Swiss-Prot record:
SUPFAM superfamilies: SAICAR synthase-like (SSF56104). It comes from the Bacteria. CDD domains: SAICAR_synt_Sc. Keywords: ATP-binding, Ligase, Nucleotide-binding, Purine biosynthesis. Pathway: Purine metabolism; IMP biosynthesis via de novo pathway; 5-amino-1-(5-phospho-D-ribosyl)imidazole-4-carboxamide from 5-amino-1-(5-phospho-D-ribosyl)imidazole-4-carboxylate: step 1/2. It comes from Colwellia psychrerythraea (strain 34H / ATCC BAA-681) (Vibrio psychroerythus). GO terms for biological process: 'de novo' IMP biosynthetic process. NCBIfam families: PRK13960.1, purC_vibrio. It holds the Pfam family SAICAR_synt. This is Phosphoribosylaminoimidazole-succinocarboxamide synthase. One of its GO terms (molecular function) is phosphoribosylaminoimidazolesuccinocarboxamide synthase activity. Its EC number is 6.3.2.6. Transmembrane segments: none annotated.
Length: 367
């Protein structure tokens, strides 16, 4: 078996019993279980949710996306070995820590396999909850253009690239394209202010105005938990994106939870502490891959300019990256996962076959 066979590139074709279309995201696919299977698993496994809760199987892949495109490599390498398992392991670690420290629950009810979560259905808050401790990335690009108002926050003069901000800043954006919200352009992932959220809290799926403060508190507390833990392994938590949603608790009441993923190299910038103190930025996140792509192709504007999306998609489709590039990304992801969790990331020989066997034999979800 060659290395490409150990990569789970296609994750939306599993024979899981469902009566709904499979949702295929950039990295994860979601299989909504039938009402009968959801109720059965809640009873058999003792999940702490109402008996009529809708459950789903969420399967991560090893695909790598950047600049809204999926990238692949030579030798039919359609993903990054170990990436999916590393991302799930990191999220599992932080979600568990959040719960132990009394912050909030997540949507995860069970982990049958390193690539698989069983989750309860949540109503997502339509906000990309972004926190920044350092000025870099899109904030720095805006700053260099003379912009000093960022998501309604006034930035001081004299800031230096990659420097630490005086306080943790929350700089939210929309989750996808939201239409009909006054003052919020109907474009993907557009920056918004707290006032935008307050004035239109229902459009962002908040149950009440008070829940805005609750979400902000969970965002700050979650960031601080991860930042403190990363500092102990000499890593700098630079910025991150959280997602939140509502689920029903066992009493049928709404509760705000963390969802999607948290504190991973896909959703965060993580810098090596020793290198940062020496004046260098060494990425232990997907940002390193993004920078490589910007340097790899002659016309970086294709990757940054949303008006050139068709050219960008052709670039990703027609160019196979060197195998060494994907293996470097693999090492970045598995190394940081092992540092965070203290456990080795083991590559599955045939992840799809393993998942099918477990879901058939232990969960009776495959005929």
């Amino acid at each position: 078996m060659n290395l490409a066979d150990k990569v789970l590139a296609v994750n939306n074709d599993l024979p899981i019993r469902t009566d709904s279309p499979v949702h295929s995201g950039k990295v994860r696919s979601v299989y909504w279980l039938t009402a009968t299977d959801s109720k059965r698993l809640i009873e058999e496994k003792g999940y702490d949710v109402p008996s009529d809760t809708s459950l789903a199987i969420m399967v991560i892949s090893d695909r790598i996306s950047a600049f809204d495109c999926i990238w692949s490599g030579e030798n039919d390498m359609r993903g990054v070995p170990g990436k999916g398992a590393a991302l799930n392991a990191i999220s599992n670690h932080w979600f568990k820590m959040f719960k132990e420290q009394g912050l909030a629950d997540s949507h995860i009810l069970d982990i049958p396999h390193p690539f698989v979560w069983i989750v309860q259905k949540a109503k997502p808050v339509m906000i990309e909850a972004i926190c920044r401790q350092y000025i870099t990335g899109s904030m720095w690009r805006s700053y260099t253009k003379g912009e000093r108002d960022f998501c309604g926050i006034e930035l001081p003069e004299g800031l230096a690239k990659d420097s630490k901000l005086t306080s943790l800043l929350q700089t939210p954006s929309t989750k996808g394209i939201l239409e009909g919200i006054p003052g919020v352009p109907a474009v993907d992932d557009v920056n918004i202010t707290r006032k935008n959220i307050e004035d239109n809290f229902e459009a962002f799926n908040f149950k009440s105005v008070d829940d805005i403060a609750r979400y902000e508190k969970l965002l700050t507390e979650g960031f601080d938990v991860i930042s403190t833990a990363l500092s102990k392994i000499d890593q700098v938590f630079v910025d991150t994106k959280f997602e939140f949603g509502y689920v029903k608790d066992v009493n049928g009441d709404d509760k705000l939870i963390y969802m999607d993923e948290v504190g991973t190299p896909d959703s965060s910038r993580i810098w090596d502490g020793e290198q940062y103190r020496a004046g260098k930025v060494v990425e232990n996140s997907k940002e390193g891959f993004r920078q490589l792509l910007l340097n790899h192709f002659p016309d970086a504007d294709i990757l940054l300019n949303k008006d050139r999306m068709s050219e960008r998609e052709a670039l990703a489709r027609d160019n196979k990256l060197p195998l060494s590039v994907l293996m470097d990304v693999s090492k970045t992801y598995t190394d940081i996962a092992e540092k965070i969790t203290g456990n080795k990331i083991v590559l599955s020989d045939n992840p799809k076959a393993e998942i099918i066997a477990i879901l058939r034999e232990q969960y009776q979800l495959i005929d």
